[in-house]
């Protein structure tokens, strides 16, 4: 199997693991036998193992470490009172009539999937911390400076309700190119479609909507690509991205009849790659304990340091170097890392390595690239 295919296969196994692990209040996970090798710092794929060419056959096996028994902590309940209510508009059909976000080189309808776009409007908060953020990830933050916003989400799911497996992956769309991209959909869409997942892409950051300094990508930012369609969108800045993402995930949980076409989710998992993984790292440490929106997190190709909690024009609150994953959430957090993420300039994840726990796992995949 090529490294890129292996990455995709493990990525989907991680998604399945998060859902399987959060399906009950407590579950016991058996040992992984030869599939994974463990060190005090991390759990890595064994490059010489036969299993390295074929992912684990069960989510429980793929999560397990060398410990004979691992107990997943009690999953906390979703706190609707800690998340603002959004107004949903859509499906959106205005403007040029096309959703500005690539789905791949095929027609979703040919595989029994639909795609719709919705606008979410509400009031989001930024976050602040009275104390400097520490490397442990056990941060205490408070909401501040609320601001109105309107963003968009894209929903892809099975047309036939009977094929829906109950799992929803909510992807923090990546804006490194100056416009919205969905790299984790690109990695995992074949297996997601086969298994019956719903995928939701969230425009959480300002650049994807308003554009930025990238001259090549500016024309594909939403407001530039289709001013008539995306004219109503408003983004107050990336300090608000965390709460916007929370509210989008909460809407999937509470307004599924409209957003998911009547498909009721059993598990809602947050995913994100590269810059989005940096954001998710900070989200897990700062915001997740406040809201408990998601049943698990797949943090794909991050570096040693999380994204800033807050930034200009609000107070600058950078993440510490390194930024570890807090271990007290009670839901799975899976770090999936390429070899580039470990050693690449500006990434250096080796500084953020931490021991595996009942809820935190790290998968390092030899021979693979960041993107």
Where are these regions (language model features)?
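C-terminal motif of bacterial Sec signal peptides marking the signal peptidase cleavage site
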Residues: 15-18
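Bacterial signal peptide processing site
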Residues: 20-22
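Extracellular mucin-like PTS domains
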Residues: 24-66, 70-71
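Catalytic-loop region of hydrolases
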Residues: 69-187, 288
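Active-site machinery of serine-nucleophile hydrolases
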Residues: 103-105, 109-111, 115-126, 146, ...
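Conserved acidic catalytic loop of the alpha/beta-hydrolase fold
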Residues: 244-265
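Primarily recognizes the serine-hydrolase "nucleophile elbow" in alpha/beta-hydrolase
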Residues: 264-314
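The feature captures the conserved acid-bearing segment of alpha/beta-hydrolase catalytic domains
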Residues: 301-370
């Amino acid at each position: 199997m090529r490294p890129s295919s292996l990455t995709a296969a493990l990525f989907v196994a991680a998604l399945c693991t998060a859902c399987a692990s959060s399906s009950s209040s407590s579950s016991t996970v058996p040992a992984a036998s030869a599939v994974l090798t463990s060190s005090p710092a991390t759990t890595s794929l064994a490059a010489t193992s036969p299993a390295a060419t074929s992912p684990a056959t069960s989510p429980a096996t793929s999560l397990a470490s060398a410990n004979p028994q691992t107990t997943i902590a009690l999953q906390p309940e979703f706190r609707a009172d800690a998340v603002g209510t959004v107004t949903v508009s859509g499906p959106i059909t205005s403007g040029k009539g096309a959703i500005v976000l690539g789905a791949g080189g095929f027609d979703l309808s040919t595989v029994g999937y639909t795609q719709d776009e919705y606008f979410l409007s509400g009031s989001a908060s930024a976050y602040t911390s009275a104390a400097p953020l520490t490397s442990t990830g056990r941060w205490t933050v408070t909401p501040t400076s609320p601001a109105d916003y309107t963003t968009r989400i894209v929903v892809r799911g099975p047309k036939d309700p009977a094929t829906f497996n109950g799992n929803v992956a909510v992807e923090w769309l990546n804006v490194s190119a100056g416009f919205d991209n969905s790299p984790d959909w690109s990695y995992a869409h074949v297996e997601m479609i086969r298994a019956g997942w719903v995928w939701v892409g969230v425009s959480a950051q300002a650049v994807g909507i308003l554009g930025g300094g990238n001259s090549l990508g500016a024309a594909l930012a939403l407001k530039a690509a289709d001013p008539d369609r995306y004219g109503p969108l408003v983004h107050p800045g990336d300090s608000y991205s965390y709460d916007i993402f929370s509210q989008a995930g909460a809407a999937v949980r509470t307004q599924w009849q409209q957003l998911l076409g009547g498909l009721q989710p059993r598990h809602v998992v947050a995913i994100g790659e590269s810059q989005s993984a940096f954001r998710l790292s900070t989200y897990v440490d700062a915001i997740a304990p406040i809201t408990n929106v998601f049943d698990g997190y797949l943090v794909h190709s991050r570096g040693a340091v999380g994204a800033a909690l807050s930034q200009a024009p609000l107070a600058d609150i950078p993440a510490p170097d390194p930024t570890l994953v807090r271990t007290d959430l009670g839901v799975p957090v899976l770090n999936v890392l390429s070899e580039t993420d470990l050693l690449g300039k500006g990434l250096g994840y080796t500084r953020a390595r931490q021991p595996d726990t009942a809820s935190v796992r790290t998968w390092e995949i030899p021979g693979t690239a960041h993107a």
